[in-house]
Amino acid sequence: MLKLAAVPMPAPEPNNPNDPIHLLCAADARYGGYAGIMLASVFRANPGEAFDIHLLSDRMRAGDRRKLAALVARAGSRLTVHDVAARLAGYSDGIGNHLSRTAYARLLIADLLPASLPRILYLDCDIICTGALRPLWQLAAAMPLLGAVPDRTGERWKGRLGLPAAAPYFNSGVLLINLAAWRERAVAATIIDWMEANPDKLALADQDAINAGLWTEITPLSDCWNLQIGLDSGPLPAARLNEAVLLHYTSAHKPWRFRFRGLGAEIFLRHKRQSPWRFKPPTFRLVYRLRKSLNKRVGRWRPASPASPIASAKREAKASGP
């Protein structure tokens, strides 16, 4: 039986304005524009802040990549694009209702990101930033392995994963990652091992595996850093929206869908209108239903074969461990 380990909250490091915030995101052809809207909100809420953006691109459209490059340059920040399409070729696109194989891209970070980079902040594309990220980044230096916010719907997932009743379940849409510890302990290999051993338990991609394999080692963060406002998260007082720094539109009901009326709809639309993707059309429910049907046919998880790029990454991760 696993035991719940108490993970102390790290003390913030001194504010160093010369230290850029290293930010990681991943997008495919469907989500490239939404990654751009997310980053535009980050820059708007953090004027004068320097960012070093690492974008994991899985078949992103050339137009979105050009807009992203121009957006980052105007913000006085730096963009590095890592093409991961070939590395994800062993994965099916049909993971779930609103997830694609790109959800697994962050498992490649130990191999893709510079070895000299000690830590990074990962943000999902379905997030809007409304405040300063420097206070969150200050926590990263003392983070033992991962920092994350508990999932507001986590109780419904724990039984499926076999987690103890006292165990937390974290949302992986915002992660503070200690890259040195991630590499040293071959975390990606641990996650992939669990997915290969438990394909029938996977519903939320690597978020499930992160919780199943690492829940005793994740540092809980305040939900102001990942306020989940999906339609399945329940109602929230308006004051909570005002206090949050990162709004996360969880579940399949995204704010870019036609006639979306969920919590935070106007906030998303306002940031979209102020971004280079202001004319990006909404998606429609019929397309969503077709994709959902195809996902059920394809399957949620295809274990990596010994020759697949992900299996290779797993071997590399184990080889680089202690």
Where are these regions (language model features)?
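A glycosyltransferase accessory/donor-loop signature
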Residues: 1-30, 37, 48, 179-322
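Short, acidic, metal-binding catalytic loop of nucleotide-sugar glycosyltransferases
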Residues: 41-49
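Short internal beta-strands
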Residues: 52-59, 147-149
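Active-site-proximal specificity loops/subdomain of glycosyltransferases
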Residues: 64-112
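Short alpha-helix within the catalytic core of nucleotide-sugar-dependent glycosyltransferases
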Residues: 66-69, 115, 130-141, 188
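Short aromatic/hydrophobic "clamp" motif used to bind/position activated sugar donors
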Residues: 120
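Catalytic metal- and UDP-sugar-binding loop of GT-A-like glycosyltransferases, i.e.
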Residues: 123
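Conserved donor-nucleotide/metal-binding helix-loop-beta segment in metal-dependent transferases, i.e.
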Residues: 127-161
